[in-house]
Amino acid sequence: MSTEDLYQDDVEMLDDYEEPVPEQADQQQRDDEYAEHAFGYADSDAEHEEQSGDHHESPMLDSLELDLTLRCGDLRLTLAELRRLDAGSILEVSGIAPGHATLCHGEQVVAEGELVDVEGRLGLQITRLVARS
């Protein structure tokens, strides 16, 4: 019997609804716990409700630096319009009210807020945190 025949026999014996192999289940649980601790997101609302009163912070992850971006809207220009831009040009931005911005981690929206002056520098005052799911 060839290796392919043995493999095919194993595949035919598998049930689509079998429980995951213990090692896979353990790895999935570790991955879920890491994501939850690192980003504060739980896989289900029930899990989140259970943990909201008993949230364990991970001191090892507290020093993890994340790249966040502030988005203040969208605009679309033709190449000709882009080439005509010069100092003093004013661009109309759509998708958000003046003075507002969205705080994002990659494509994930984290919060929304209002742009404010912080001792001569631009800041964001959070007005709404996106629900963690």
UniProtKB/Swiss-Prot annotation:
GO biological process assignments: bacterial-type flagellum-dependent swarming motility; positive chemotaxis
Task: Give the molecular function GO annotations.
Answer: cytoskeletal motor activity
By its UniProt entry, which Gene3D superfamilies does this protein fall under?
A: SpoA-like
Q: What induces it?
A: Negatively regulated by HrpV.
Ordered alphabetically, the record's keywords are: Cytoplasm, Virulence
Q: Which InterPro entries match?
A: FliN-like_C, FliN_T3SS_HrcQb, SpoA-like_sf
Q: Which GO terms describe its cellular component?
A: bacterial-type flagellum basal body; cytoplasm
What spans are recorded as compositionally biased (Basic and acidic residues)? 49-59
Identify the domain of life. Answer: Bacteria
Keyword Cytoplasm among UniProt keywords: yes
Q: Where in the cell is it found?
A: Cytoplasm
Short name of any one Pfam family annotated for the protein: FliMN_C
The annotated region (Disordered) lies at 1-60
Q: Where is there biased composition of kind Acidic residues?
A: 1-21
Q: Which family does it belong to?
A: Belongs to the FliN/MopA/SpaO family.
How is this protein organized at the quaternary level?
Homotetramer. The four monomers assemble into two tightly bound homodimers. Interacts with HrcQa.
Primary role: Component of the type III secretion system, which is required for effector protein delivery, parasitism, and pathogenicity. Probably participates in the formation of a C-ring-like assembly along with HrcQa.
What remark about domains does the record contain?
The HrcQb-C domain interacts with the HrcQa C-terminal domain.
**Full protein name:** Type III secretion protein HrcQb
> What's the source species for this entry?
Pseudomonas syringae pv. syringae
- Please state the gene responsible for encoding this protein: hrcQb
